[in-house]
Amino acid sequence: MNIFQKGHPFIIAEIGTAHGGSFEEAQKLIEAAAAAGADCVKFQIVYADEILHPDTGFVSLPGGNIRLYDRFKELEVTKNFFFRCKDYCKICGVGFCASPFGLQSLDELIALEPFAIKIASPELNHLPLLARTAAKAKDIPIILSSGVSKLKDIEKALDTIKKNRSNKNMDNIALLHCVTSYPAPETDYNLNYLTIPVMANWH
């Protein structure tokens, strides 16, 4: 299915890191998404060093306080994990996509030949990541989240992508209009302002 096909809402089910590093749990989540009618599932490829400094601080969890860096380290999995997930997505009849948070995770994601590359809102101003995504993704659709972003930041991100695409083609770029208020009032969506393919983010 074409992610930009008109007349059909394209449903991406967020798995993120909810698998907890267990392939068996990932299988269950993929199966559940497929059974619910999702077109695609999305994971997060996490490397702690791409996201935060080791001395960022602590987070309070049910088991007590833990270093935030250590928590992100726990979310790291082997490269083979996502190859297996992608293969299982194919078996279940859903597409595979993921969010990278830095250049290492991006390169690994591109090697997986995903259905799409989803850039998370905090990475909207990560211009080196956007530039490499545009240059190396070729025909892979790019979904760009825009939560808590100013219009000038969105324009700069799109300009960075366009400048780094060899063919300057923006037909397979979509903005994920992410109003960071869950759930967001309809009066705050302002969707008519956007003139490229738009997605909405519900939590």
PLM region spans:
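Catalytic cores and adjacent flexible loops of soluble metabolic enzymes
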Residues: 1-203
